[in-house]
């Protein structure tokens, strides 16, 4: 296999397929119940006051529904949503162009907000607090500041790395929520809903097979469903059963535990090349031929969650379950596990 399925799925922007399955309302959004309750309360309170929502920060791993929730909030409020991302706002003029296009009550959604340049953040602070934009015209002794009043708006920021947000920016959000991985039952419900929208019959056991390999992530679940649907159409009778789902996912080298080829290469490198660790992330990235940030964002969270590896102050360490998974004998002294 070439590029990891999970890398393609979690790092790629939302496709037309993803958008077609996106729930439009809180009532159709499965999972994240506590966050949904908070957001629905905020929306109702703002509606009763006839005011705009406070600024909201959504953090968590990719594919858990941050963008979907931002759109649901806009639908619930009945306002427009303007979408951009941190890397797209390269200079103050880019931010000014976005902010001056807003109308009262609009939502500005900034994905990857942790990637905003610190200089851009300085312009964002008065916009968030006082709905004011201060622009510096000219340079040197001729420099002067022009103040533009902005309509009251809501900033919804999304980040996969909340720790990279500066403290001043983080403190300006009225509500900060971290999305968690989804349970097996929640993923089954999402898969069955998506299958219904796609007019694909799926057995409960077939949905479970897909859910078990979805890494707690709806975007992965829907991408796997898309592949299994195609497999069922060509190799089966169109119905997604337990056996058919198993065969379809085995074909793309995703095993019963949800590990793909890159996951196994990562574990093999830790065990056989680095004697179980501890090993640094950059060394691992070179050993498996993958970008370090991809390993950290896409593969490590699942492997840590499943108990295959652990992070220690000295580096990554392969845990006993990793040796068992790869059919290797654990070191007798259990090196690294207690570091």
UniProtKB/Swiss-Prot annotation:
Region annotation Large ATPase domain (RuvB-L): where it falls in the sequence: 1-182
Subcellular locations according to the entry: Cytoplasm
Binding positions (Mg(2+)): 67
A GO molecular-function descriptor: four-way junction helicase activity
EC number(s) recorded for this UniProt protein: 3.6.4.-
GO cellular component: cytoplasm; Holliday junction resolvase complex
Positions contributing to ATP binding: 21-22, 63, 66-68, 129-131, 172, 182, 219
One matching Pfam family: RuvB_N
Residues bound to DNA: 311, 316
Entry remark concerning the domains of this protein: Has 3 domains, the large (RuvB-L) and small ATPase (RuvB-S) domains and the C-terminal head (RuvB-H) domain. The head domain binds DNA, while the ATPase domains jointly bind ATP, ADP or are empty depending on the state of the subunit in the translocation cycle. During a single DNA translocation step the structure of each domain remains the same, but their relative positions change.
Subunit and partners: Homohexamer. Forms an RuvA(8)-RuvB(12)-Holliday junction (HJ) complex. HJ DNA is sandwiched between 2 RuvA tetramers; dsDNA enters through RuvA and exits via RuvB. An RuvB hexamer assembles on each DNA strand where it exits the tetramer. Each RuvB hexamer is contacted by two RuvA subunits (via domain III) on 2 adjacent RuvB subunits; this complex drives branch migration. In the full resolvosome a probable DNA-RuvA(4)-RuvB(12)-RuvC(2) complex forms which resolves the HJ.
Name by which UniProt lists this protein: Holliday junction branch migration complex subunit RuvB
């Amino acid at each position: 296999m070439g590029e990891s399925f999970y890398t393609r799925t979690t790092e790629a922007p939302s496709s037309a397929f993803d958008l077609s399955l996106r729930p439009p309302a809180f009532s159709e959004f499965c999972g994240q119940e506590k966050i949904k309750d908070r957001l629905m309360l905020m929306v109702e309170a703002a509606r009763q006051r006839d005011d705009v929502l406070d600024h909201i920060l959504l953090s968590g791993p990719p594919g858990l529904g941050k963008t979907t929730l931002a759109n649901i909030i806009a639908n619930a409020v009945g306002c427009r949503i303007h979408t951009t991302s941190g890397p797209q706002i390269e200079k103050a003029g880019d931010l000014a162009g976005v902010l001056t296009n807003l109308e009262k009550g609009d939502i500005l959604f900034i994905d990857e907000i942790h990637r905003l340049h610190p200089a851009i953040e300085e312009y964002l602070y008065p916009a968030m607090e006082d709905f004011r934009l201060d622009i510096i015209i000219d340079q040197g002794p001729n420099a002067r500041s022009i103040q533009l009043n902005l309509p009251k708006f809501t900033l919804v920021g999304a980040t996969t790395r909340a720790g990279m947000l500066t403290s001043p920016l983080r403190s300006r959000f009225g509500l900060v929520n971290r999305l968690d991985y989804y349970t097996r039952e929640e993923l089954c419900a999402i898969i069955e809903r998506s299958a219904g929208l796609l007019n694909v019959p799926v057995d409960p056991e077939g949905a479970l097979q897909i859910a078990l390999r979805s890494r707690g992530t709806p975007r992965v679940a829907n991408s796997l469903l898309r592949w299994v649907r195609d497999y069922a159409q060509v190799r089966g009778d169109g119905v997604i059963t337990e056996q058919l789902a198993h065969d379809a996912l085995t074909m793309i080298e995703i095993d019963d535990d949800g590990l793909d080829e890159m996951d196994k290469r990562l574990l093999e490198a830790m065990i056989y090349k680095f004697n179980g660790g501890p090993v640094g992330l950059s060394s691992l990235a070179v050993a498996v031929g993958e970008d370090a940030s991809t390993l950290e964002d896409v593969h490590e969270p699942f492997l840590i969650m499943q108990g295959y590896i652990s992070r220690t102050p000295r580096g990554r360490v392969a845990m006993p379950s990793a040796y068992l998974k790869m059919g290797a004998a654990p070191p007798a002294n259990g090196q690294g596990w207690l570091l």
